Swiss-Prot record:
Pathway field: Carbohydrate metabolism; D-galactose 6-phosphate degradation; D-tagatose 6-phosphate from D-galactose 6-phosphate: step 1/1
Highest taxon above the source species: Bacteria
Protein name in UniProt: Galactose-6-phosphate isomerase subunit LacA
Keywords noted in UniProt: Isomerase, Lactose metabolism
Keyword set includes Isomerase: yes
Molecular function via GO: galactose-6-phosphate isomerase activity; ribose-5-phosphate isomerase activity
Coiled-coil boundaries: none
Pfam families: LacAB_rpiB
GO biological process, one term: D-allose catabolic process
Keyword Flavoprotein belongs to the record: no
SUBUNIT field: Heteromultimeric protein consisting of LacA and LacB.
Family statement drawn from the similarity comment of this UniProt entry: Belongs to the LacAB/RpiB family.
Underlying gene: lacA
Record InterPro entries: LacA, RpiB_LacA_LacB, RpiB_LacA_LacB_sf
The organism of origin for this protein: Clostridium acetobutylicum (strain ATCC 824 / DSM 792 / JCM 1419 / IAM 19013 / LMG 5710 / NBRC 13948 / NRRL B-527 / VKM B-1787 / 2291 / W)
Length: 142
């Protein structure tokens, strides 16, 4: 699995931590914002585009509260973005919504919780079935 990760200035420290965490677990990470100072819209767009272009399987965008990255991610065709701040939501959005992008707020979650959220998101597989109707509806919106 390849994960694209990026952050604005407020999320940069958490992004660096999570990038190293994922690499330590053997996951290939594509850092779309290697330099600090990229704004929220640009950073979230870069990770969304990595999934759209099939450079990455999933994406993680980090800003101060997660809401901005969520709004940007949701504007991209083929992206199902979920703003999460707990492990259960990260698991369920993968299982029920086939989310291919997470938006995380560095001002909301700490490093350990963010690690747990990524673990839950990555480990969970999309269930399909009755949830496919919703996913199809989401994919037709843009």
């Amino acid at each position: 699995m390849k994960i694209a990760i990026g952050a604005d200035t407020d999320g940069f420290e958490l992004k660096e931590h999570l990038k190293n965490y994922l690499k330590s677990k053997g996951i290939e990470v594509i850092d779309k914002t290697p330099e600090k100072g990229i704004n929220l819209v640009k950073s979230a767009s870069l990770v969304a585009q990595a999934v759209m272009n099939k450079e990455a399987d999933r994406a993680v965008a980090i800003d101060e509260y997660g809401a901005g990255s969520f709004m940007v991610g949701a504007k991209h065709k083929g992206i199902i973005c979920a703003e999460v701040s707990d492990e259960h939501s990260a698991k369920m959005t993968s299982q029920h919504n086939s989310a291919n992008m997470l938006a995380i707020g560095a001002g909301i979650v700490g490093k350990r919780l963010a690690e747990g959220m990524l673990d839950a998101y990555i480990a969970e597989k999309y269930a399909g079935g009755r949830h496919q109707i919703r996913v199809d509806m989401l994919n037709k919106m843009l």
